[in-house]
Structure formats: structure tokens, C-alpha cells
Amino acid sequence: SNAPEALPDTGPMAFYLAADTEFGVPRAMLHVSLRRPDGLISVADSVRARLYRNLVEDDLNALSYPALLAGVSYGISTPDRGFRISLGGYQDKQSELLQVVLDRLTSLTINPDRFLVLKTELENSLQDSFKNRPFQQGFDRLRQNILSSSWPATDQLAELATVTPEDLSLWRDAYFEQVGVEALAVGNLDMAAAQRIQAQLANSLVITPTAAAAPTVTQIDGPVTEVMDIDHNDASLVFYLQNKDDTLLETAKSNLLGHIIAPEYFSSLRTEQQLGYVVSAFSPEFEQQGGLGFVIQSPSAPAAALHQKTLEFLAGEVTRLADMSAEDYAQNQEGLIAQV
């Protein structure tokens, strides 16, 4: 597809079109972000958005099969910046579906019985997270320590307990009283079709310029160690090295380093030393903040030993990387580029 092009004269809305007519099929994708200044970052907003999204999708379930038969699909998500509607499939059928989803999202009459069912389902899902494998719980805790929009299940459960149908309706009304809108259309549609979608959004919403909210990313100052009490026989380690800044150059460096050392980490700690059955090195990104991550779960070695073996591995990698030939380095660069 072509590079996205901003539609002219859209007022406070930002609307981008990436037209792609190469295959001649009348299909397109549409993503619409509906934003508030604070986003969905606080635990109160995050929990309410998740529950409300579930209620809307539950109410729209009767539409799913007819939409599929008509060659279109939809989804509603709740990223940090705000609610997002996504549509896909035949472009000429999307306008009607978009209107139904918009109307339901902004003005759903909450059924108390369905509210209770879906609230209980969300509570059970959060409770189940306490049973996740140790390495999963460890990485969740890392995310919670780094990102201001990531909340422990205990905090979410406490907030969820306070939510009533009336409270949720009032929260929804306040959210959609006025919103910022950013939309992207990709596929086989022209400027005129995109402008019709833009007009439809403008007629359905009260739109105001709104900067995209973003969670705070904690910058780690010196080594931080946290020991988690998890009811499991295995030991686990989540080891994170944060880049010095969130520039694209630093992220590219850590991604390349992760690409180079990940197979060696698995080979050394899993295959050769047989320290654990979950062994992985990777390059996690929190917003734009890059870094390196190491995860291992072991039925035989304590966490302190997993930490020490990871440090020994990294010390050995310093020497291996210093001795790497230009050809091997270039081959790794090309391998990573092929994956991007």
C-alpha cells in the first residue's frame, strides 16, 4: 500500500488514507481511535473500559455471524490511548456496520443481568492470573513496575468491586461527551470513500482536538531486585536490562543484540546446562523504551543460581561478540531486517 496520506479539511479529526488498489479487490481495513486526554491509563479507567468493552461486544454478538456472511468483521479494543474500533472486509459494507458499532459503543443500555455475568467473568479472569506460571507472573510484575498503565490483578479486582451498572453508564457518558478522533483507512478505497467515512464519524461524535495519552515509563536507576512469593514448586527468573534512552537507535541496537544472543542463551542454559524448560532471551519494548529481557523457569535450580548463570552467560557473550567476524555480524543484521 502507499504511505498514509492525511485527508484535507477534517477539522479537529485526524484521518489518514493508505490506498492500495494493486489487487483490485474491494476490501479495506479501518481503525478508529476515540481518545480522551487521560486515556485509559488509571486503574479506574482501565477496569471500566475493559468491562464496558465486554458488554458492548456481548450485545453485538448477534451481529457477528451476519457480518461474517456479508464479508466484514469488527473488533473493539481498549489500548492505553482510548477505545479503538477496527473493521475489515468489503469496503462497501463497512459504513453500515461502523454506524451500528458506534451507536452501541456510545449509548449501550446496560442490561443488569448481563452486567453481573460479565463482571463475574472478568473477576474470574483476574483471579486466574494468580495461577499463571511463575515466569509469566514475573514478567507481569516487570511490566507493572515499568508501565504506569499496567496494574496488578489485586488493584483491578478492588476497583472492579466498586463498579455498578449506573456507575459504568455515567463513566461511559462522560468519556464520549467529547473525544479526539484519529482514523486510518487502508485498502482499496479512494479519497471520496474515505471522506464519506470521515463525515460519518463527524456526524456521530462530538470531536475535539486531543493529544494522545501515553503511560509513564519508569527509568530504572541502578539494580533493582524483587523477590515474589509464588505458590509453585519451580523457581523462575525474569532479568531485564533497560536501554539508556528510548531513541530508535538504542532500540535498534538492543533488538539486534537480542537477535544475536537469544539462540545462544537457549542453547547454553536449556540444551547444555538443562537448567529449565522455559528459557528465552528477547527484546521487550514498553512504549518506545527498549531493552533486553531474559526469562527462565526451572524445576531443579533456585532463582539465585539462575541469576548467576545468566550473568556468567552475558560475560561470555561480551567476548564472543568482540570476536565476531564482519560477515557473521552482517548476516545477523540481515536476518533481523528480514523479520521486521
Which residues are covered by each model-predicted region?
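C-terminal, active-site-flanking charged/polar segments
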Residues: 203-206, 261-262, 312-315
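Non-catalytic, conformational "gating/processing" segments within enzyme and secreted inhibitor domains
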Residues: 139, 143, 165-201
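Glycine-centered hinge/linker elements that transmit conformational signals in sensory
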Residues: 197-211
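Short beta-strand/turn micro-motifs at beta-sheet edges
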Residues: 17-21, 71-75, 169-172, 224-229, ...
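M16 family metallopeptidases and their MPP-like homologs
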Residues: 24-107, 117-161, 178-186, 234-245, ...
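His/Glu-based metal-binding/catalytic segments typifying zinc-dependent metallopeptidases
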Residues: 1-53, 209-264
